[in-house]
Regions:
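Bacterial N-terminal signal peptides that target proteins for export
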Residues: 1-10
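Hydrophobic core
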Residues: 13-23
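Alpha-helical transmembrane segments
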Residues: 17, 269, 273-281
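Secreted/processed peptides and extracellular or luminal domains of membrane proteins
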Residues: 21, 25, 254-257, 273, ...
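Residues that cap or anchor secondary-structure elements
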Residues: 27-216
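Soluble non-cytosolic domains of exported or imported proteins
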Residues: 125, 238-239, 269
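Short hydrophobic membrane-inserting alpha-helices and related fusion/pore-forming segments
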Residues: 243-272
């Protein structure tokens, strides 16, 4: 009799535990569903209103989720963008998302695009919300801000030429719970290890969604001031041909500093100096005078040089 009572009690206890686990699981699923609905709605709103700035890359590289954010390969090496707060991202079955419901965080990857979506609760009269995103960058690569508010990645040399990856974090966006866009911008930390997204929330309260969107590409752009390009253009075609012959192994044997600088940078960022012949054609094709303090850009392998904004492209 006592044995029967014990068995019934054990079964009842197991049923209670199972029911508790089932309820807990249902709660997690419910939170996950709400979070996904929130971020998908926000993304849909900004897409429909044309707020999301799409970046086109010539050599797409796959954006991959990890347990902290997204990562991908560039011409400079691996670049990662992560949530600054601790998160435990878990893939959501049959979707492109990974989420952490406790942190209100989600990540989405589609081909070369990675998105980190964060929900924040804004209190009444709270003027600004600041959310930090951590960056993991290759050595000697730093984040730079462009005129449109987007973030790029650049490496500089001591001889004036710089290289910018086509990988870019788009102009930031943030929306309130009704899908209305909010004023927002990025600030780069002094050591380049993070960016902070600042959102103007002084006229709202309630939930907001904010997001950095990174597009990965392996293409590389090279930038000079006009005075430096003029020096490079003065080099003979034979010198450029010699650079190709030397290759990356013997690039330092070149005599001219301007040529050594760009050839060496090509080896580091594009893996080859062969494209320098195309640069020679691009210099010949540019018929205007190079202006000393203007910034000019050449895409690896192309036959054209174009003027670009100084900010973000040419080192200051």
């Amino acid at each position: 009799m006592k044995s029967s009572i014990f068995i019934k009690s054990a079964i009842a206890m197991m049923a209670a535990v199972a029911l508790g686990a089932s309820n807990a699981s249902a709660t997690v699923v419910s939170r996950e569903k709400v979070l996904l609905e929130t971020v998908i709605s926000a993304e849909g709103n900004v897409t429909q209103k044309g707020i999301i700035q799409r970046v086109k890359v010539s050599q797409p590289a796959e954006a991959k989720k990890n347990d902290k954010g997204v990562t991908g390969e560039t011409g400079f090496g691996e670049i990662s963008v992560s949530f600054s707060e601790p998160v435990k991202l878990k893939d959501v079955t049959r979707t492109e998302y990974a989420t952490d419901t406790e942190a209100g965080a989600a990540v989405k990857t589609t081909s070369e695009v990675g998105m980190l979506l964060q929900t924040e609760e804004v209190e009444k009269h709270e003027q600004f919300v600041k959310n930090k995103w951590d960056l993991s960058l290759p050595r000697d690569v730093k984040p730079v801000s462009f005129d449109d508010g987007s973030i790029g990645f650049r490496t500089d040399t001591e001889n004036g030429v710089s290289a910018v990856s086509e990988t870019r974090i788009s102009t930031p966006w943030a929306v309130d719970k009704h899908g209305n866009p909010l004023e927002t911008w990025y600030e780069i930390s002094s050591d380049g290890s993070s960016i902070t997204q600042v959102v103007n929330t002084q006229d709202i309260e309630g939930e907001i969604v904010l997001d950095p969107r990174i597009t990965y590409g392996q293409g590389v752009y090279y930038n000079w001031y006009g005075s430096e390009l003029r020096t490079l253009k003065a080099e003979s075609a034979a010198s450029f041909a010699l650079a190709v012959g030397y290759g990356c192994v013997n690039v330092n044997r070149l005599r001219h500093p301007a040529l050594v600088a760009v050839a060496g940078l090509m080896c580091v960022t594009a893996g080859s100096v062969v494209g320098i012949e195309a640069l020679r054609f691009a210099l010949d094709n540019f018929k205007e005078s190079f202006k000393d303090h203007s910034c000019y850009q050449w895409k690896f392998g192309s036959h054209h040089i174009t003027p670009v904004a100084v900010k973000g492209n040419c080192s200051l």
